[in-house]
């Protein structure tokens, strides 16, 4: 009976999974009871976590002194970091300070190639702008073999490059600041100039600078560009360079009040005005000595 069962449909029979008979698997890897994976599928998959699932959010463990201070709430805003020009080396610091207000947008994804002995190696370059629409903006670019990896890396680099944006008024100081404080210029291949505009004008510019200016929280601005603006990467970098220079100018309202100290003649004028008895000094002339 056992021989009949094995011949009919058992593991060793023609109808069993170990043979290439009718209705069964053909030989090779993965066939039979002791096949590839041993009943656990074709492996656990690649990437983050199990196949088809999402990686669990892990708690942020800072690795720098600045990260520890931010997580322990010793530093509560980015302005305290910018005040002392401390380098930000963890993107989680930006997430911790700005939180859900931070928005990102992919400006462009372009393929780039490198000639090698084996042929052309193609990678993808991603340009990502990030900002909170309230005075903070960043720009990042990353190359990778995969588009998703390039975008993810560009977002991290954009967070690390976030700069504060100084805003001002065009005329009367009524309401909230709405435009750039003064004329600023940025250069990266092409030259971009930002000019203050009256309230209600909007952003008069090309689409790429307009996205960066909106993310920076600027509502009204004139722009002018010179050079080759068709290269999106250089155009975006020049705009970001101009925006980052808004805190580079020491405007008169930031000048420290100069305190002049009086000279002793001015400080003791009343004392010098008092009448004093004049002391006359008689000069006595020494008698001449005759020499022989």
UniProtKB/Swiss-Prot annotation:
User: What's the superkingdom here?
Assistant: Eukaryota
Q: Where is this cross-link: Glycyl lysine isopeptide (Lys-Gly) (interchain with G-Cter in SUMO1)?
A: 274
N6-acetyllysine PTM positions: 262, 274
GO MF assignments: RNA binding; structural constituent of ribosome
Q: Which residues carry this modification: Phosphothreonine?
A: 251, 269
The residue ranges of the S5 DRBM domain are 102-165
- Keyword vocabulary terms for this entry: Acetylation, Citrullination, Cytoplasm, Isopeptide bond, Nucleus, Phosphoprotein, Repeat, Ribonucleoprotein, Ribosomal protein, Ubl conjugation
Q: How is it modified after translation?
A: Citrullinated by PADI4 in the Arg/Gly-rich region.
Per the record, the covalent cross-link Glycyl lysine isopeptide (Lys-Gly) (interchain with G-Cter in SUMO2) lies at: 274
Q: Which Gene3D superfamilies match?
A: 3.30.160.20, 3.30.230.10
The covalently linked position for Glycyl lysine isopeptide (Lys-Gly) (interchain with G-Cter in ubiquitin), per the record, is 54, 58, 274
Q: Which SUPFAM superfamilies match?
A: dsRNA-binding domain-like, Ribosomal protein S5 domain 2-like
The record's annotation in InterPro entries points to: Ribosomal_Su5_D2-typ_SF, Ribosomal_uS5, Ribosomal_uS5_C, Ribosomal_uS5_euk/arc, Ribosomal_uS5_N, Ribosomal_uS5_N_CS, Ribsml_uS5_D2-typ_fold_subgr
- Report whether Ribonucleoprotein shows up as a keyword of the record: yes
Sites where Phosphoserine occurs are at 263, 280
Q: Which GO terms describe its biological process?
A: translation
Task: Return the annotated region ranges for Disordered.
Answer: 1-56
Asked whether the keyword GTP-binding is assigned, the reply is no
Q: Where in the cell is it found?
A: Cytoplasm; Nucleus, Nucleolus
* GO CC term, one of those recorded: cytosolic small ribosomal subunit
Residues recorded as bearing N-acetylalanine in the entry: 2
Q: What does this protein do?
A: Component of the ribosome, a large ribonucleoprotein complex responsible for the synthesis of proteins in the cell. The small ribosomal subunit (SSU) binds messenger RNAs (mRNAs) and translates the encoded message by selecting cognate aminoacyl-transfer RNA (tRNA) molecules. The large subunit (LSU) contains the ribosomal catalytic site termed the peptidyl transferase center (PTC), which catalyzes the formation of peptide bonds, thereby polymerizing the amino acids delivered by tRNAs into a polypeptide chain.
Q: How does it assemble?
A: Component of the small ribosomal subunit. Interacts with zinc finger protein ZNF277 (via zinc-finger domains); the interaction is direct; the interaction is extra-ribosomal. Interaction with ZNF277 competes with the binding of RPS2 to protein arginine methyltransferase PRMT3.
Q: Which family does it belong to?
A: Belongs to the universal ribosomal protein uS5 family.
Name the UniProt record assigns to this protein: Small ribosomal subunit protein uS5
**Which species is this record about?**
Oryctolagus cuniculus (Rabbit)
């Amino acid at each position: 009976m056992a021989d009949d069962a094995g011949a009919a449909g058992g593991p060793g029979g023609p109808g069993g999974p170990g043979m290439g008979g009718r209705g069964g698997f053909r030989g090779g890897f993965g066939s039979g009871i002791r096949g590839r994976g041993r009943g656990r599928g074709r492996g656990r998959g690649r990437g983050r976590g199990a196949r088809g699932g999402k990686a669990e959010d892990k708690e942020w463990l800072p690795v720098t002194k600045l990260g520890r201070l931010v997580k322990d709430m010793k530093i509560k805003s980015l302005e305290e970091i910018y005040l002392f020009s401390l380098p930000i080396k963890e993107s989680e610091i930006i997430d911790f300070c700005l939180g859900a207000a931070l928005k990102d947008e992919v400006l462009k994804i372009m393929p780039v190639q490198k000639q090698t002995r084996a042929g052309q190696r193609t990678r993808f370059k991603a340009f990502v702008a990030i900002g909170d629409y309230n005075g903070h903006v960043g720009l990042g670019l990353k190359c990778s073999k995969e588009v998703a990896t390039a975008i993810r890396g560009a977002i991290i680099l954009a967070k690390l490059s976030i700069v504060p944006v100084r805003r001002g008024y065009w005329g009367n100081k009524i309401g909230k600041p709405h435009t750039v404080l003064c004329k600023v210029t940025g250069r990266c291949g092409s030259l971009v100039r930002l000019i203050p505009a009256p309230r209600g004008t909007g952003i008069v510019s090309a689409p790429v600078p307009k996205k960066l200016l909106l993310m920076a929280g600027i509502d009204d601005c004139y722009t002018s560009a010179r050079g080759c603006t068709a290269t999106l990467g250089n155009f975006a970098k020049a705009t970001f360079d101009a925006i980052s220079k808004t805190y580079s100018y020491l405007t008169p309202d930031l000048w420290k009040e100069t305190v002049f100290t009086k000279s002793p003649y001015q400080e003791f004028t009343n004392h010098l005005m008092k009448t004093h008895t004049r002391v006359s000094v008689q000069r006595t002339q020494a008698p001449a000595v005759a020499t022989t």
